[in-house]
């Protein structure tokens, strides 16, 4: 029974923290409208940027990252050894929030947060990959997907083998949620950062 509770509670904490839709909350509070009716309809920072409010997009990015970071750190403190469960649940919460009928974001910023919390070297590789690909291509989705795929590889190479399975699973989730972006990349029609499409 105790084992079941110690598995369930980290999942609940991770999911609840991860499911807070900061992008939607911030755009509504600042009068920017319903983010789900803007641009791609996604609740993440890239779509917030399409409102023309760069500061709001940066705040969304940091808060989405921060909730993933917080979920893992809190669970590590209370239930040592269960941080991978919290990481999984936090990203799932962001992508499938119950409050928004399970229609959330694509998990890139939150995955960066959990990567940093699991082991900062993994998070550093994630950030450098994301920003590097974004800088070179100016395509947000390509940067995010590249970083997600690199994360489990970095975990394996840097000696964090216990985190490889959860990071690999989350990378697959991120790729799945970007399937429309992948189709547009192949067609050469994926919008670049700054586009309002």
Curated annotation (Swiss-Prot):
Look up and give the organism this protein is from: Novosphingobium aromaticivorans (strain ATCC 700278 / DSM 12444 / CCUG 56034 / CIP 105152 / NBRC 16084 / F199)
**Superkingdom of origin:** Bacteria
Its assembly, as annotated, is: Probably interacts with PlsX.
| UniProt catalytic activity | an acyl phosphate + sn-glycerol 3-phosphate = a 1-acyl-sn-glycero-3-phosphate + phosphate
Q: Name one GO cellular component term.
A: plasma membrane
Q: Where in the cell is it found?
A: Cell inner membrane
Cite the InterPro entries for this sequence: G3P_acylTferase_PlsY
Q: Which residues cross the membrane?
A: 7-27, 55-75, 78-98, 116-136, 157-177
Ranked from the top, the taxonomy reads: Bacteria, Pseudomonadati, Pseudomonadota, Alphaproteobacteria, Sphingomonadales
Indicate how the chain sits in the lipid bilayer.
Multi-pass membrane protein
Alphabetical UniProt keywords: Cell inner membrane, Cell membrane, Lipid biosynthesis, Lipid metabolism, Membrane, Phospholipid biosynthesis, Phospholipid metabolism, Transferase, Transmembrane, Transmembrane helix
Q: Which HAMAP family match?
A: PlsY
Q: What is this protein called?
A: Glycerol-3-phosphate acyltransferase
According to its UniProt record, which protein family does this protein belong to?
Belongs to the PlsY family.
Q: What GO terms are given for molecular function?
A: acyl-phosphate glycerol-3-phosphate acyltransferase activity
Pathway assigned to this chain's UniProt record = Lipid metabolism; phospholipid metabolism
Q: Which Pfam families match?
A: G3P_acyltransf
What does the UniProt function comment say about this protein?
Answer: Catalyzes the transfer of an acyl group from acyl-phosphate (acyl-PO(4)) to glycerol-3-phosphate (G3P) to form lysophosphatidic acid (LPA). This enzyme utilizes acyl-phosphate as fatty acyl donor, but not acyl-CoA or acyl-ACP.
Enzyme class, broadest EC rank: transferase
What Enzyme Commission number(s) does the record list for this chain? 2.3.1.275
GO BP annotation list = phospholipid biosynthetic process
